[in-house]
Amino acid sequence: MPAVKVKENEPFDVALRRFKRSCEKAGVLAEVRSREFYEKPTSERKRKAAAAVKRHAKKVQREQRRAVRLY
């Protein structure tokens, strides 16, 4: 869990913003969302494999677009 020490004469809003940023960097909210409901190991593997395929297709598409523009 990220911890933020409030500096002297620091407004609460600024400290809260620093805390939110540190939570975002640590991935706390993403972790909570992923653990909100139980996901079977097979479903998790299937979801991760589908995400990998999607990332690869996106990467290939970007490379093809880049190759077309170089003339």
UniProtKB/Swiss-Prot annotation:
Domain of life of the native organism: Bacteria
GO terms for MF: structural constituent of ribosome
Chain residue ranges for the region called Disordered: 50-71
Basic and acidic residues bias locations: 60-71
Extent of Basic residues compositional bias: 50-59
Keyword line: Ribonucleoprotein, Ribosomal protein
A GO-annotated cellular component: ribosome
Pfam families (UniProt xref): Ribosomal_S21
Keyword Ribonucleoprotein listed: yes
One GO BP annotation of this record: translation
Family named by the database record: Belongs to the bacterial ribosomal protein bS21 family.
Name of the protein: Small ribosomal subunit protein bS21
Species annotation: Pseudomonas syringae pv. tomato (strain ATCC BAA-871 / DC3000)
